[in-house]
Amino acid sequence: MPVIEQVGAREILDSRGNPTVEVEVVLIDGTFARAAVPSGASTGEYEAVELRDGDGRYGGKGVKRAVDAVLDEIGPVVIGLNANDQRLIDQELLDLDGTPDKSRLGGNAILGVSLAVAKAAADSAELPLFRYIGGSNAHILPVPMMNILNGGAHADTAVDVQEFMVAPIGAPSFVEALRWGAEVYHALKSVLKKKGLSTGLGDEGGFAPEVAGTTAALDLVTLAIEAAGFKPGADVALALDAAATEFYTDGIGYHFEGMTHTADQMTEFYADLLGSYPLVSIEDPLSEDDWDGWAALTASIGEQVQIVGDDIFATNPERLEEGIGRGVANALLVKVNQIGTLTETLEAVALAHHSGYRTMISHRSGETEDTMIADLVVALGSGQIKTGAPARSERVAKYNQLLRIEEELGDAARYAGDLAFLRYVVETR
């Protein structure tokens, strides 16, 4: 029986130079596993609370309190438990914390332990993590949703939309999809240079030029797709993450591209984009608290494009259930650190799939070399992963892990491709 023997933790740095938590678990059979916790830049109000120190170290962003929570409180509770009992262990963590938002021990402390336990159990069983979580039928490789042009909170520019993504839906395999995305990425750099625009990078490895607005950015990405030799829509589609909570003011509206808009006006804006660009997915088009606006937007354009709920759902089964009942969105963005345990993440995905919602597994802007989400997306058969541009090692680490998984699966591997968005695929611009 793979009993937990030791639990350790330390403060490490994420890709933005901010501290985060790393947890190590050792089992009685000698198995060792490590998990590092990511952190977001545009964080929703309903996410699990990260425990930060608030002192003079790292501008108050140190995580020694979370590390101490692992060492002093969580470790003694989980030591002696069977690492295979993931649900039991995660429930012990929730009970120990005792708050609805994990604010006592910190979602960063709790998640680190939850993920490290799962990794250790998989290693003890001599199974790859995707197989341990997903079972023998896990075989779907995801479409990489590559954020190749950054705006919003991910870049120091006036571009309001946070992410402009390319989705290589026409590729025959993941290895080819990765190549296509990388070639478009490099083509975009050339396009930007020719136009005298900056090729500096944002938090997630995408370029962060100062451009006039959303349509100008989409035009640049479309030019890059064509310059790389691909057909916009049929080969490589487009996707957005508006992160609209970031430009919404309660009681005033959406301050977007120099004007104040209502939810209905934002919906009209997105509808116009759908008529001009091969968009297959729009994430967080409205604010996290604008339930009525979301429902109206989904009713208006939800048959034409995937509408992904991130901040509004926060990977929380209870919020997702409310959204399903109100006709909000048709897809769930999945971020393990939003909810804080592996078990709750799996519950949210199961609810989404059971309700006909698609899922997209996502990184955070503050990432580490941890590749867990690459295994998770295959385990869950989500068919979509968002983990940044094909640049910067904390992003590429996930893509490289997916290459290994595809190779390990061999002939059993299937690339999701346009099936991930079939009802929304647009052949031409």
UniProtKB/Swiss-Prot annotation:
Its cofactor is Mg(2+). Gene3D superfamilies: Enolase-like C-terminal domain, Enolase-like, N-terminal domain. GO terms for cellular component: cell surface; extracellular region; phosphopyruvate hydratase complex. It catalyses: (2R)-2-phosphoglycerate = phosphoenolpyruvate + H2O. Its main location: cytoplasm. It is an enzyme of class 4 (lyase). One of its GO terms (molecular function) is phosphopyruvate hydratase activity. Coiled coil: none annotated. CDD domains: enolase. The active site is at residues 204, 335. This is Enolase. It comes from Mycobacterium leprae (strain TN).
